[in-house]
């Protein structure tokens, strides 16, 4: 095996493959952000954490790199620009950000501020629409999706009166009548869109966004009925936008191509019917390579920005030329691809439970046969086939566990059973190799058994809920010591009192594994990990399991001289905030504390000290204090 190096660290944690050039390792082995992309200034995460700590921020800490948001947007726009130039497509492109992906002002507001021409916003609810009406640049595109009542429709039409290009996308046939009534009442011509329910279906965790069973969209007959009603009302020209959506993360570019071909047929047919289609909105689907495998895995993608853009532009360009149709403005709602890279959750390891090392205990008289068998297995490690011995050890362990449950082994003998088994397991692991096909199954099992548990100061349910909900994968990397070979393998568990509060799948060496190479924490130091690509959906979907609340947050912005500053800090939730949220009356809690202290009959000084400690607990951060390791 080659000696450890920075390049090997990059490969071990797959950094070049998932980072898209926004993260790398510096010469000191520190994880760095490159907010302006590959070749730009490198910001060392440990330095940023020190600056944040000096400003009173604590771990777990969400770091946002605002410049990455703008860079992602510009790269997306540039990819469509190149595709349109190559294919001689004159319709233009608008990148629309659906704020459901991350509604926080530091994200949606930052994109709106940097967006300029060729940028718009999408809302799927009344609260989102109210935010968008305030954020949107005059004259920009605003897409209104989702279920709509009369108030939602009226607010969207008011947006059009205020100079925004708001489009009400008809998701259900019943919406049209209300739109026509409200537009007449307000004296405004509506901008209408229709969501088509395509038969094409992408594979993956979000595939129910498309296909005949999709939650939203009109079937072919319903589309024809909509056109007939608009023609009858003399408003066919108001139907200006076609919308379809195949999923939030489409891994296979062929699925994108199939969906676009089907959507283009709708565009051609409706245009020939007299609809004034000027916009083609292909929705979301542009994925993020969380795995770094560039594959069809559900958390990966087998294409890049340029191929994605070309796949959408080409069939529409060809159809416009073949049918002599004016090319429509192309729109995507690629919120995940815009935001995922910009945010990193930094967490600290609170404790480590080492995997049992095993030992060979001193033989005892009248030892149970199962222990003698394990001793013989251990003694034969150098003389018999290694896999045969491993299977015998597994069988003996299972037998011994059953005997203990039946009362036929003592607790001491049960512990000796484990000692012998793990002594065998470590030696077997050292003699197996992944290059030998017959060894791989045993290696996988041993790698799961012989791992340390890293208990980490955060909540999976709050900070990365998709890990629990849909087995989402996020790359995880130590923020320092990457110039040092990791000597342990570990799995990560959070602070919650829930067995689901763990991470089961890790990005490693252009693949996925059930554990991750990690360092043993040093005495007197904090060991910190970065969880990357968490900028899309995770904050909004986070849950307050065990009353762990929002974490501290800091925005990191590049300065004109190539430096950076930590700005727009936001303190995370404190315990009193969380208790108030779930209905506790804080004054009643304080009164209950005081009553219990008084009833305990303590000395005045001790009683005052306890009241002070209770108040500090009530108003403190919901997460643990960062500690160094013993």
Where are these regions (language model features)?
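Charged, compositionally biased N-terminal leader segments and the immediate start
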Residues: 1-31
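Charged (often Lys/Glu-rich) extended helix/loop segments that serve as interaction or gating elements
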Residues: 4, 317-630
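Low-complexity, highly charged intrinsically disordered N-terminal segments
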Residues: 20, 25-98, 103
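Short, glycine-/Ser/Thr-/acidic-enriched flexible segments
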Residues: 30, 38, 68, 102-104, ...
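Flexible, glycine/charged-enriched surface loops at secondary-structure junctions
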Residues: 59, 63, 85-90, 273-277, ...
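Active-site-proximal beta-alpha core segment in soluble small-molecule metabolic enzymes
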Residues: 88-281, 286-288, 302-307, 315, ...
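Generic beta-strand/beta-sheet core signal
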Residues: 98, 124, 145, 171, ...
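Short glycine/threonine-rich loop-to-helix capping motif typified by GTGT followed
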Residues: 250-258, 289-307, 337-352, 543
